[in-house]
Regions:
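Short runs within selected transmembrane alpha-helices of multi-pass transporters and secretion channels
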Residues: 76, 80, 145-163, 171-179, ...
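Hydrophobic transmembrane alpha-helices of multi-pass small-molecule transporters
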Residues: 67-70, 182-187, 216-220, 292-295, ...
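Small-residue-rich hydrophobic transmembrane alpha-helices
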Residues: 55-115, 152-171, 266-269, 282-340, ...
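N-terminal transmembrane alpha-helices
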Residues: 13-45, 49-50, 63-78, 82, ...
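Helix-terminus/linker motif at the lipid-water interface of multi-pass membrane proteins
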Residues: 34, 38-56, 125-132, 188-199, ...
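Structural signal for membrane-spanning alpha-helices in multi-pass inner-membrane proteins
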Residues: 117, 160, 186, 190, ...
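Transmembrane helical elements of multi-pass membrane transporters/channels
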Residues: 23-43, 144, 178, 211-215, ...
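Short alpha-helical transmembrane segments in multi-pass integral membrane proteins
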Residues: 1-26, 83-150, 196-252, 308-373, ...
């Protein structure tokens, strides 16, 4: 690729109209994340046709899966934000250094969870249930997901390298490849088709890690062949402490926010298992279904963060403000659609998961109550990503800690004391109401402390 084409690829972040730019960066990732949500749901749909115990087991394994995603995506988000800022400042050498250090960190994360899989997977499942069948399903599933998790870490990092340089379509393609492989392999391994052994819950895990590894291979190929804004080479590479520090200035708050989600789901599983394993299954199904609403918003985030990062480096505050406002509008439209579906068609949504009459009776009301928080969550998700892109990841972390640990879990526990499982679901809208208030306050703070001084600097420079 010529230098002029490379400059155009980066400079459009600072000059193209915000609406078309945000859509061009976000829509491919929205599509790929919808497919990601689809194959997560397909996993659970197939597992639910084994039996409800298998579905409950997968739900109990979710906190560790979410923790792996927290480290993989959080580190990649840090690389995304820092790399985009380097390109905005015209520092391509440091951008390439950020990319290579990001891949090094992804490798380290994969090794860490591999060790956990060997030593702690079975103990983690046993800490949540005494049911022998659920314990066996959960241990089999989680062991495979952790032992082969390197594919997840590399796939997330390689996708974010493509997104951070404005090549969202390639990132979408790599994720689609992995997702389609997962979907195709799920029934084969779970039910033992085409001569394969019937693996049940373990088969879902095998299909998942196979899709992640193939998606990572596709992402690496696309970066090497098509991503000329960065240079991926092991020649002369050494981990750079200063670069890693800048990556984790954004990455650690992002990791912490998602890791808090693992703590929250672990706590909720333990609150709900006191009622029944069906309550845990309902909670697990909700998390699969809500990804259809949240994944497109995460796609908007993936398109928004490099635009904000570039324009932050290029000192263009008006474009930053326009990007955030437009992203919030898109997010609210998506969340309103999710709210309508959950309120009008809960029985249809649960029926897809082979729900028993008991699960339907509990799940219909659960979906309708929890979905109340969707519109508030749209604003909160966009705001938190904007804080990270502006180098204020601690604000996003504060919102996440308060929402999930200080409000949601204690509220759920207190409501569970009523002895009515339906009361527990109200903890979600209560926590989101607190979070939306905090996000509004912090957004005003960022505008006052970051964007207004930037605008004043532009006016001073223009006057001179």
């Amino acid at each position: 690729m010529s230098d002029s084409v490379q400059k155009y690829s980066a400079s459009r972040m600072g000059s193209a109209p915000i609406g078309p730019l945000l859509l061009s960066c976000s829509v491919p990732m929205m599509i790929s994340m919808l497919v990601q949500a689809l194959y997560n749901i397909v996993d659970s749909i197939f597992v639910s046709h084994v039996n409800e115990a298998a579905l409950s087991a997968v739900s109990l394994a979710f906190p560790i899966q979410n923790l792996m995603i927290a480290f993989a995506v959080g580190t990649a988000v840090g690389v995304n934000a820092y790399l985009s800022r380097c390109l905005g400042e015209g520092n391509r050498a440091e951008a390439s250094r950020a990319a290579m250090n990001g891949l090094f960190l992804a490798f380290c994360g994969g090794i860490a969870f591999l060790v956990f899989g060997i030593l702690g997977a079975r103990a983690f499942i046993a800490s949540q249930t005494t049911d022998a069948q659920i314990m066996q399903y959960g241990a089999d599933y989680l062991s495979i997901c952790t032992l082969w998790c390197m594919g997840l870490f590399l796939q997330c990092m390689l996708e974010k390298l493509l997104v951070s340089t404005g090549r969202s379509a390639f990132a979408m393609a790599s994720q689609l490849i992995g997702a389609l492989v997962n979907i195709a392999l799920d029934p084969i391994f779970i039910f033992g088709l085409f001569g394969m052994p019937r693996m049940e819950a373990a088969g879902a895990a095998v299909a998942t890690v196979a899709g992640q590894w193939i998606g990572a291979a596709a992402g690496l190929t696309m970066n090497l062949l098509c991503n000329k804004d960065i240079n991926l080479t092991l020649k002369g590479f050494r981990p750079a402490g200063s670069t890693i520090k800048r990556i984790y200035a954004v990455g650690i708050p992002s990791i912490a926010m998602n890791a808090i989600g693992s703590v929250m789901t672990f706590a909720m599983n333990n609150i709900l298992i006191a009622f029944s394993s069906t309550a845990v299954a309902v909670f697990g199904v909700y998390f699969k279904l809500q990804s259809f609403a949240f994944m497109p918003i995460f796609g908007i985030n993936n398109g928004m963060v490099p635009i904000i990062g570039y324009n932050y480096g290029a000192r263009q505050p008006k474009r930053i403000t326009q990007t955030i406002k437009l992203a919030v509008c898109f997010a609210e439209c998506i969340m309103l659609c999710g709210l309508i579906l959950a309120e009008v068609f809960p029985q249809v949504l649960l029926g897809v998961f082979n729900a028993s009459p008991t699960m339907l009776a509990m799940g219909i009301l659960a979906l309708r109550i929890i979905a109340i928080h969707f519109p508030m969550a749209g604003f909160n998700v966009i705001s938190s990503s904007a804080f990270q892109a502006l180098g204020r990841g601690t604000l996003a972390l504060s919102v996440s800690v308060i929402r999930q640990l200080i409000v949601l879990v204690p509220a759920a526990w207190l409501l569970s004391r009523t002895g009515n499982v339906n009361a527990v679901w109200f903890a979600f809208p209560i926590a989101e109401l607190v979070a939306v208030t905090l996000c509004a306050v912090f957004m005003r703070k960022c505008h006052r402390d970051i964007l207004l001084p930037m605008e004043a600097g532009q006016k001073t420079a223009a006057a001179v």
